[in-house]
Amino acid sequence: MYPSSHSLTSLTDRSGLLFGADYNPEQWPAETWPEDIRLMQEAGINLVTVGVFSWALLEPREGTRNFGWLDRVLDLLHDGGIRVCLATPTASPPAWLGHEYPETLPVDADGRTLWYGSRNQFNPSSAKYRQAAAAITESLAKRYAGHPAVAMWHVGNELGQVSYDDETALAFRGWLTRRYATLEGLNRAWGTSFWSQGYGSWDEVLPPRRAPYLVNPSQTLDFQRFTSDQLLSLYRAERDIIRRYDTASPVTTNLMGFFRGADYFAFARETDVVANDWYTDPADPDSHRFGSLTHDLCRGLSGGTPWLLIESATSGVNWREHNVPKQPGELRIDAFSAIARGADGVCFFQFRQSRFGAERFHSAVVPLAGEHTRVFREVADLGKDLQTLRQLAGTPSTARIAVLFDWDSWWAAESPDTPTNRLEVLDQLQAYYAPLHSSGLAVEVVHPSADLGRFALVLAPSLFLLSKEHADGLGAYVRGGGHLVVGPFSAVADDNGHLAPGRFPCVLADLLGVDGEEWVPLAAPVGVVFGDAPAGQARIWAEDLALNSGTAEVVAHFGGGRLEGRPAVVRNQTGAGHSWYVGADLPPLALEQVVADALESAGIAYPLAAPLPDQVEAASRGGHLFLINHSGQPQEVEPGWASVDLLTGGAHGERLTLPPFGALVLKEPAPQELSNLKNHRTRGTA
């Protein structure tokens, strides 16, 4: 990584919280641009991303540069007090590149070329594409490094392309050679003795193209790793060019939360600022919860330092099957959710709604109907709110609870040859996150290799693939006094996706005090019982488990079918810590009981005096508690102390009412007073 001085602090020290949008002036006549600046100022916008999709305008023919329009735009923005996140336009190559050099175009697993006429039409392994991308990036960096408007750089856009062409096959072989050194090493890692798949020459090795039946899962896993590395190398190449000309401004690229196509833990180590896209689905009442989880991933990716919500929607999008607009007030509370969970800025796609192109129906800061609209008024009101909250800029956002997540494990777990395709990783992640979110507890989503010592409780909802190194780290964490909850179908495979011989969960069996002999995808739901109290049913998954340690105890058992009386949840003590293994897809009530037991054992108090209503979110940052109502109904909340709302100055008692789609930002009591309040709260009252 580059020095920590390359961070959002260089922007927020001057502007407070960042507020902005993607600005695409090339879609509009130049006469519109001064009016755009006026509207930005009226809305309180202080940062815009420029140039994301402008390659064809910047380089209309190979080697020809057209910078006049961009010179004027940057000068206008600077004169208007608007800072710029200048993008390299390499996400959408011009038609001439694909026409003259078809090898730059991606090829799908069926061998079909994906043509220009859309966006993202590039092959990450194409040498010609990389050459052209480097050339336009260097031209931009050389010309605009030091321009007073440019405060940050944005590489490409939503890097996620994949190709299966011959040039990619060559690059894949090089990646495999560096990983395994020899064909013998590759054949062992891929288990090619199965189905007569052994390779006798590197020229025979291909990406996992369309095949008659299931493709080798180890080959597929390595290709996903390779593709992620190729995308990261694209980012690095452009970043390093920019750095030659601008050593001061932060460089980033926009991530997409839980996007399956790239390992964002690897990306986060290379970016100066973690920047993420998040688009709430107004039609889904639980979308805000997944949004919170995504923000907590950003909190983990950034190590608790501020991050940036670089894309979101003011209202409806255009790419879902049914694009419901946001209700009045939703724009504001969605932004607050990100700020509460560590974001130092909120930006929208895009500034002006397009009249043409594939995203013409996507909402924007300025709708086609103009400034005298609900959406623009709400944006301007949010701009004022963010100025009121400017004291939160730069404040850290850390947690005592970690949720473990690993892209390698995700890729491996959802191979089509597993016992079920219904036990999806993100579903498991959300299920374990839900009781923490509903209690207002702060969470960081981190990699299994993270320093876990700063967390009192660690949840691992799904770690299908777990290396011995990471398993040893979890063991050391528990023995040292940590508390660990492990979800089903974990510690099943090694780094190559090979299953371990013996009883599962393999490298965690001794730590967890339990092992199993058979996975049991369920033909019918089976009950889960805590003591004598039924707690719902597992519907997808169960495991045939047995205790293997005198320190292990059965917390819950199965209540029916062939697994009647067998352990469903096991708790074990190892050293100074405790672990829980969950051998089923527990229903919400049962999982809530397991998490509550772990919280109590870890000494983590509930932050509020009473449980939160279902559609209310609570999160703390910078000594302030954000209370956010994601429903269209008033909601009663009981923080347990009297306080003042930072947004309005209004006083509130120990119990309060949140208006529909409303929010409060309450000053929290002094740390010791707050700690005393929390320590008196029990599970029954929280």
Which residues are covered by each model-predicted region?
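The substrate-binding groove and active-site-proximal loops of carbohydrate-active enzymes
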Residues: 18-29, 51-68, 115-134, 156-163, ...
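Conserved, mostly hydrophobic/aromatic
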Residues: 21, 40, 48, 77, ...
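Aromatic-lined substrate-binding rim segments of carbohydrate-active enzymes
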Residues: 35-42, 49-113, 141, 238-245, ...
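Short, well-ordered coil/turn segments that N-cap beta-strands
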Residues: 15-17, 44-46, 78-84, 146-151, ...
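Carbohydrate-binding surfaces of carbohydrate-active enzymes
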Residues: 202-205, 248, 257, 268, ...
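Short, acidic/polar
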Residues: 27-42, 133-139, 256-266, 327-335
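N-terminal carbohydrate-binding accessory modules
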Residues: 1-49, 60, 75-79, 83, ...
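Polysaccharide-binding and catalytic clefts of secreted carbohydrate-active enzymes
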Residues: 110-273, 277-293
